[in-house]
UniProtKB/Swiss-Prot annotation:
Protein name as it appears in the record: Ferredoxin--NADP reductase 1
Pfam family, one: Pyr_redox_2
Keyword entries, A-Z: FAD, Flavoprotein, NADP, Oxidoreductase
Superkingdom of the source species: Bacteria
Molecular function GO terms recorded: ferredoxin-NADP+ reductase activity; flavin adenine dinucleotide binding; NADP binding
Residues reported to bind FAD: 36, 44, 48, 88, 123, 285, 326
Organism: Shouchella clausii (strain KSM-K16) (Alkalihalobacillus clausii)
InterPro entries: FAD/NAD-bd_sf, FAD/NAD-binding_dom, Fd--NADP_Rdtase_type_2, Ferredoxin-NADP_redctase_2
Record's catalysed reaction(s): 2 reduced [2Fe-2S]-[ferredoxin] + NADP(+) + H(+) = 2 oxidized [2Fe-2S]-[ferredoxin] + NADPH
Length: 348
């Protein structure tokens, strides 16, 4: 029988919100477990590991990969329990007001409080609805860009008009032989400046969509685009195709748990990031509230606020927030260690 180990807090989702909350929960002496669906931590940043991030406070321009590594290092400061490759699909409130969370295989996690840091749910890329397209996925049909240099000196077609498609088009224009963008609408998502830049450095076809892929073996060599209104067709030769048609979101378990949602399907939360169910808190992209900052910095603030909410939920007499880290006794030994490491570095 599975051993029933009870945690103070179980965090669902290992993106920026979940990772920072894991660290902060350690600062608040909570016994914490982090459960992530992917086999790797990092959340959405895993979609842009090579992109440079500029807008996280106090952090000089840093790649997504470096930020993930730093977040993971910080999250593991207090030795939390981390479970990867587990999709939480059900939350049950027990008569003693604790929660049991079940993963897809039926494994249970026992916890006194829950934090939903599940972003937009399990992202499932919208695939091309063209028969046989999947055979090119092993070679030059991509649904995300995790490594820029594989597109160096290539003729790349990007299909899609969202934020990510615009960003990738601009970045690839610096290294690829040619970047062509097709989109079924004339308008593109993302910052106006980025869209303008994309228009000046790539060839754009709107309103067009991919109608046919032509390949030999497992590689696409050309693509037929069709005009969305007239059906007029044009063929272009390519070395790689990137499709970014958005993601299907799996938010079903939030609905099944009976949590109050805003109209757009995201979680309604109180000022201390508690959901409509006592003991279930939330942080990051999964929440909506007035003043929402849907950025990594916003996820950090919401994470710390939610952990403080959890602490007071479990112990109403607890301080409202953790004692500042610069003067926190918890770090005394670690600070000594850091000083010694720095001195040793200077000596070498
Ligand atoms: C292309 C792109 C570029 C961006 N650039 C920037 C930028 O420059 N600066 C910036 O501040 N922000 C940027 N963002 C936004 C930023 O990435 C998000 O705001 C941030 O990742 C939100 O963090 P999160 O932890 O709330 O959610 P996520 O990062 O989405 O993480 C949620 C995690 O929860 C997991 N999960 C979900 N449901 C379950 C479940 N049921 N069971 C187990 N695990 C589950 C998911 O697998 C995922 O790992 C960008 C976003 C994109 C898409």
């Amino acid at each position: 029988m599975q051993e029933k180990e009870m945690f103070d807090l179980t965090i669902i989702g290992g993106g920026p919100a979940g990772l920072y909350s894991t660290f902060y929960a350690g600062m608040r002496d909570l016994k914490v477990k982090l459960v992530e669906y992917n086999k790797e931590l990092g959340g959405k940043i895993l979609f842009y590991p090579e992109k440079i991030i500029w807008d996280v406070g106090g952090m000089p321009p840093t790649t997504g990969r470096t930020l993930i590594n730093q977040l993971v290092e910080q999250a593991t400061t207090f030795n939390p329990t981390i479970c990867l490759n587990e999709h939480i699909v059900r939350m049950v409130r027990e008569p003693d007001n604790t929660y049991t969370l079940f993963n897809e295989q039926g494994k249970a996690h026992y916890t006194r409080a829950v934090m939903l840091a599940s972003g937009h749910g399990i992202p499932v890329m919208q695939k091309l609805e063209i028969e046989g397209a999947d055979r090119y996925e092993v070679s030059n049909l991509h649904y995300t860009v995790t490594q820029m240099d594989i597109f160096a000196n290539k003729r790349v077609l990007i299909s899609g008009g969202g934020n990510a498609a615009v960003d990738w088009a601009n970045e690839l224009a610096n290294i690829s032989k040619e970047v062509v963008v097709c989109h079924r609408r004339d308008e593109f998502g993302g910052h106006e400046k980025n869209v303008e830049q994309m228009k000046s450095v790539t060839k754009i076809h709107t309103p067009y969509q991919i109608k046919e892929l032509h390949g030999v073996g497992s590689a696409i060599e050309a693509v037929t685009l069709a005009h969305c209104d007239t059906g007029e067709q044009r063929q272009i030769e390519v070395d790689a195709v990137i499709v970014n048609h958005g993601m299907k979101l799996d938010g079903c378990f939030l609905i099944e748990a009976g949590l109050a949602l805003e109209e757009d399907g995201f979680l309604r939360v109180s000022a201390c990031m508690e959901t409509s169910q006592p003991g279930i808190f939330a942080a990051g992209d999964v929440t909506r509230h007035e003043g929402k900052l849907q950025l990594i910095s916003g996820a950090f603030v919401e994470g710390a606020t939610a952990v403080n909410g959890v602490k007071q939920f479990l112990d109403p007499k607890a301080d409202k927030q953790a004692y500042v880290s610069s003067h926190n006794e918890k770090f005394k030994k670690k600070n000594e260690q850091l000083k010694q490491e720095k001195q040793a570095q200077l000596m070498n």
